[in-house]
């Protein structure tokens, strides 16, 4: 039977979304590995800022340029290792138990209200999290990203579809930065 195969890139919306989710999983895994999961209470992707994500970290860790360089180095190593990103479909109750065990109370609460009996969980080298939507098959595809200190948190930037798969230049939003300090 004949068919057409179309390659999807970060220049397209669906490819860009899969890349964004996958690089976020990679970043989370790197933070937990570098800092030690016992030192992290929570990493939150707060909102979109400067065409990337503004993230915060709560725990016994201070976000510094040096920490971000260590995290980026670990991310680069995992990209080089081309680790699989594995999707598992599991019962919602099991997902709740896993998030409880992994100290993710927000996700534990989220799934306690879920009506569907099954949920998709993604894992990367032993680290599990929930993402809505498709992921890339492995870390080897995640070669383009930037981490930037943006106190009190940090920014992660990634290729954008509206820029034909390029990472946007950083644009400091001074009014917003001032509101973070207040």
Regions found by a protein language model. Give the residues of each.
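Short amphipathic alpha-helix segments
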Residues: 23-37
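Auxiliary tRNA-acceptor-end handling modules of aminoacyl-tRNA synthetases
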Residues: 1-18, 30, 39-50, 54-182
């Amino acid at each position: 039977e004949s068919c057409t195969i179309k390659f999807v890139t970060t220049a397209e919306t669906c490819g860009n979304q899969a890349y964004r989710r996958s690089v976020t999983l990679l970043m989370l895994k790197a933070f937990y590995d570098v800092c030690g999961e016992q030192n992290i209470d929570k990493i939150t992707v707060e909102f979109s800022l400067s065409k990337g994500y503004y993230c915060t970290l709560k725990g016994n860790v201070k976000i510094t340029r040096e920490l971000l360089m260590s995290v980026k180095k670990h991310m680069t190593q995992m990209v080089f290792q081309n680790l699989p990103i594995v999707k598992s479909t599991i019962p919602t109750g099991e997902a709740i138990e896993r998030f409880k065990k992994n100290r993710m109370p927000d996700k534990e609460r989220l799934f306690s209200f879920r009506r569907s009996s099954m949920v998709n969980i993604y894992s990367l080298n032993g680290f599990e999290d929930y993402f809505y939507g498709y992921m890339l098959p492995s870390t080897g595809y995640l070669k383009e990203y930037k981490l930037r200190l943006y106190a009190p948190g940090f920014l992660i930037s990634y290729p954008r579809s509206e820029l034909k798969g390029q990472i946007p230049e950083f644009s400091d939003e001074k009014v917003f930065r001032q509101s973070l300090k207040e």
